[in-house]
Amino acid sequence: MERTYLMIKPDGVQRGLVGEIIARFEKRGFKIVGLKMIRIGRELAEKHYGEHKGKPFFEPLVGYITSSPVVAMVIEGKNAVGAAREMMGATDPLKAAPGTIRGTYGIDIGRNVIHGSDSPASAQREIALFFSADELMEYGLELDRWVYE
């Protein structure tokens, strides 16, 4: 099974969308193996968004992500990275398909409710950045045999 990292951003937390967003992934058959609410400090934000350092939107992005708590989570399932990205929709909510998370709840490209890893390699890096090994659970679900066999 593949794992991916998801983060409900400050606008999603402030607007009370956490439960709805988590429910979408559970209803799709993904297993939540890590979940916590955190306040991201500047150092962690800079590591997370390091690829954007030097770009004009870097400082506003770091300021935004550190402005309020976020919900960090790791989900597990078949094609977790690709399926989660499909469920989230395009980064720009104006271009996101109706019914996707960003298409439904996103306001603009800066307030698009959720972040998800864009590749299996990014997922590994982001999971390690936000979770220690003992914060990730290994468990089976009765549902697994219906979804994955």
Swiss-Prot record:
<comment type="similarity">
    <text>Belongs to the NDK family.</text>
</comment>
<dbReference type="InterPro" id="IPR001564">
    <property type="entry name" value="Nucleoside_diP_kinase"/>
</dbReference>
<dbReference type="InterPro" id="IPR023005">
    <property type="entry name" value="Nucleoside_diP_kinase_AS"/>
</dbReference>
<dbReference type="InterPro" id="IPR034907">
    <property type="entry name" value="NDK-like_dom"/>
</dbReference>
<feature type="binding site">
    <location>
        <position position="112"/>
    </location>
    <ligand>
        <name>ATP</name>
    </ligand>
</feature>
<feature type="active site" description="Pros-phosphohistidine intermediate">
    <location>
        <position position="115"/>
    </location>
</feature>
<feature type="binding site">
    <location>
        <position position="9"/>
    </location>
    <ligand>
        <name>ATP</name>
    </ligand>
</feature>
<keyword id="KW-0067">ATP-binding</keyword>
<keyword id="KW-0547">Nucleotide-binding</keyword>
<feature type="binding site">
    <location>
        <position position="85"/>
    </location>
    <ligand>
        <name>ATP</name>
    </ligand>
</feature>
<keyword id="KW-0963">Cytoplasm</keyword>
<comment type="function">
    <text>Major role in the synthesis of nucleoside triphosphates other than ATP. The ATP gamma phosphate is transferred to the NDP beta phosphate via a ping-pong mechanism, using a phosphorylated active-site intermediate.</text>
</comment>
<protein>
    <recommendedName>
        <fullName>Nucleoside diphosphate kinase</fullName>
        <ecNumber>2.7.4.6</ecNumber>
    </recommendedName>
</protein>
<keyword id="KW-0808">Transferase</keyword>
<dbReference type="GO" id="GO:0006183">
    <property type="term" value="P:GTP biosynthetic process"/>
</dbReference>
<comment type="subunit">
    <text>Homotetramer.</text>
</comment>
<dbReference type="Pfam" id="PF00334">
    <property type="entry name" value="NDK"/>
</dbReference>
<dbReference type="GO" id="GO:0005524">
    <property type="term" value="F:ATP binding"/>
</dbReference>
<feature type="binding site">
    <location>
        <position position="57"/>
    </location>
    <ligand>
        <name>ATP</name>
    </ligand>
</feature>
<dbReference type="GO" id="GO:0006241">
    <property type="term" value="P:CTP biosynthetic process"/>
</dbReference>
<dbReference type="GO" id="GO:0046872">
    <property type="term" value="F:metal ion binding"/>
</dbReference>
<keyword id="KW-0597">Phosphoprotein</keyword>
<feature type="binding site">
    <location>
        <position position="102"/>
    </location>
    <ligand>
        <name>ATP</name>
    </ligand>
</feature>
<dbReference type="InterPro" id="IPR036850">
    <property type="entry name" value="NDK-like_dom_sf"/>
</dbReference>
<keyword id="KW-0418">Kinase</keyword>
<keyword id="KW-0479">Metal-binding</keyword>
<keyword id="KW-0546">Nucleotide metabolism</keyword>
<dbReference type="GO" id="GO:0005737">
    <property type="term" value="C:cytoplasm"/>
</dbReference>
<dbReference type="GO" id="GO:0006228">
    <property type="term" value="P:UTP biosynthetic process"/>
</dbReference>
<keyword id="KW-0460">Magnesium</keyword>
<dbReference type="GO" id="GO:0004550">
    <property type="term" value="F:nucleoside diphosphate kinase activity"/>
</dbReference>
<feature type="binding site">
    <location>
        <position position="91"/>
    </location>
    <ligand>
        <name>ATP</name>
    </ligand>
</feature>
